[in-house]
Amino acid sequence: MAKRDYYEVLGVERGSSDAELKKAYRRLAMKHHPDRNPGDKASEDMFKEANEAYEVLSDSSKRAAYDQYGHAGVDPSMGGGGGGFGGQNFSDIFGDVFSDFFGGGRGGSRGGAQRGSDLRYTLELNLEEAVRGTTVNIRVPTLVNCKPCDGSGAKKGSSPVTCPTCGGIGQVRMQQGFFSVQQTCPRCHGQGKIISDPCDSCHGEGRVEEYKTLSVKVPAGVDTGDRIRLSGEGEAGTQGGPTGDLYVVINVREHAIFQRDGKHLFCEVPISFVDAALGGELEIPTLDGRVKLKIPEGTQTGKQFRIRGKGVAPVRGGGAGDLMCRVAVETPVNLSRRQRELLEELRGSLDDDNSHSPKTTGWFEGVKRFFGDL
């Protein structure tokens, strides 16, 4: 099944900014996260698809490659390079094509030391941890150099030998009709060396699977989609090649009270209709503790109050955002007889004066005009 276009997956245009990409990814990640959709295979697939798309498009080099070559530019099975895939670079992809047809002298580019693959780890945080910063220990599966053979793949006391088929180049040249075609050596599989006496621990691979426990320092202000790079904590390279990197991708869980949009926080504050009518003072929760909010008389549902500086300080610097509190006026329920009597008395007193409910009065006048025009 063909992969969908990464921009289509995130629902953005090709020229979208990094901020737009991040916002689109955050929306999809929140919507389809497995914690919010347990047992929903479709949502799980969409979550993985969004992760894959954002991993490519949020990296400038990968995005440039994807924009130019499409999925082939970032697909490891097609030779795509870049973090997280550990594949070849693009000169390898297209250089090999011309080498195959015209016998170009690129043999050996695949053999020898190769850099280890980059790894990706999704780190779940609550909102408080993301806003204040934290240090978290994570356990990551990876490939490390085999200690008994020191990464050579050969049993201790022996060494890999030059492949006699390709002479250590890693590729062989074959004649196909009028063309001289260069192909990966079938004996050493492009490594240029063979192991006649493989290590018992790694079976000649030179690397073994292992879990690493790492301490990750998360800076204050991170948000869903942000990445922390741990240099040299990816998979070990082969034949002495450098180790890849580990990218820790942040995913902030949904909060019970606050919603976040960039550096601003939003919450809904329920108030009684009495406080809405007469005004009052409420204690509002913030991430730094409680603050008092004055409610003016005549406050309506939907009225939004701004508490400055009680949002989030962005990870890349700048002042903290604001906390936006939206009022929701509650209608009382389960009234006692006395309470009903008081409300009936209040309703009777209000019916004589339309100035108490200007919106209601205006709405009914509009209805009358509407039917009068029919």
From Swiss-Prot:
Q: Which domain of life is it from?
A: Bacteria
Chief location category: cytoplasm
Query: What is this protein's record name?
Result: Chaperone protein DnaJ
Kindly state which keywords UniProt assigns to this record, in alphabetical order: Chaperone, Cytoplasm, DNA replication, Metal-binding, Repeat, Stress response, Zinc, Zinc-finger
Q: Name one Pfam family in it.
A: DnaJ_C
Q: Which Gene3D superfamilies match?
A: DnaJ domain, Heat shock protein DnaJ, cysteine-rich domain, Urease metallochaperone UreE, N-terminal domain
Q: What does the record say about domains?
A: The J domain is necessary and sufficient to stimulate DnaK ATPase activity. Zinc center 1 plays an important role in the autonomous, DnaK-independent chaperone activity of DnaJ. Zinc center 2 is essential for interaction with DnaK and for DnaJ activity.
